[in-house]
């Protein structure tokens, strides 16, 4: 996909203005790929700019540029967003670039070739047709940016939960617990979960998490931790936004002038000598 974008003559526009857009714009800049505009969903335009681009509406982008390539820069499980994406896909050339949650390694054709042995080894270990189909679809999506590959291997929520078999007295770690929605979801779905460690770094979201846990009438014992999960213990100065969760932290170095400093903790420290299922 990245090589294709280098050679296209169509104007390229970004859909979304969050952390994903930052990462995608950085990658495009590194590859000397020009971006012609940025637009947001209706209700999120609000007379603002992003990285030097005026944030436009979809209709304004189309009026100004005509036939465009859209790069979607965020993820969502909301049905209204899904329907809008399907509409945009029908009207435009549309891609969802795969960029890492952390780090800067891009899963492109070169990465695939360099790690082909490991990837084929993983595929050979999959035990059923659905798993192989899903693996192939994810690989095709990550290389092409074509989200329809992912749509083709979707399963109903109940079916996905049925694939998880937990032993009695399992412990569940929620490493980005947000407001506690997934704590509630999986505690209700899996009665074999006896304890939960829910970690959330953002102070506002952490308050929501605590409130959610307090309102749980029954279920597992829940320990809430206001920290950011890392590969080591220490302190981190965070850069928060109004979106879901925390978006960056500065190499686990505590900046004494920062207004938002929280502990960082490793999974090993969270669980100590206990087994995680």
Locate the predicted segments by residue.
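Phosphate/nucleotide-binding beta-alpha loop and adjacent structural elements of enzyme active sites
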Residues: 1-31, 35, 41-277
């Amino acid at each position: 996909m990245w090589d294709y974008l280098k050679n296209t003559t169509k104007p390229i526009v970004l859909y979304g203005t969050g952390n994903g857009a930052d990462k995608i714009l950085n990658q495009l800049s590194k590859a000397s790929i020009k971006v012609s505009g940025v637009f947001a969903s209706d209700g999120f335009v609000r007379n603002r700019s992003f990285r030097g681009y005026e944030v436009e509406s979809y209709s304004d982008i189309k009026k100004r540029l005509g036939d465009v390539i859209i790069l979607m820069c965020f993820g969502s499980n909301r049905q209204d967003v899904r329907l809008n994406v399907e509409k945009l896909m029908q009207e435009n050339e549309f891609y969802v670039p795969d960029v890492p949650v952390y780090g800067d390694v891009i899963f492109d054709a070169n990465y695939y070739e360099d790690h082909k042995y490991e990837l084929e080894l993983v595929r050979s270990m999959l035990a059923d047709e659905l798993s192989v189909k899903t693996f192939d679809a994810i690989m095709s999506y990550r290389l092409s940016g074509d989200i329809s590959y992912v749509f083709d291997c979707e399963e109903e929520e109940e079916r996905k939960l049925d694939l998880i078999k937990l032993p009695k007295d399992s412990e569940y770690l929620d490493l980005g617990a947000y407001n506690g929605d997934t704590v509630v979801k999986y505690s209700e779905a899996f009665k074999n979960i006896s304890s939960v460690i829910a970690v959330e770094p953002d102070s506002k979201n952490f308050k929501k998490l605590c409130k959610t846990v307090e309102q749980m009438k029954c279920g597992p014992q829940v320990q809430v931790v206001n920290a950011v999960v890392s590969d080591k213990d220490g302190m981190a100065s965070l850069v928060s936004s109004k979106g879901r969760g925390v978006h960056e932290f500065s190499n686990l170095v505590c900046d004494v002038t920062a207004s938002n400093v929280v502990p960082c903790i490793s999974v090993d420290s969270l669980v100590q000598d206990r087994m995680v299922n």
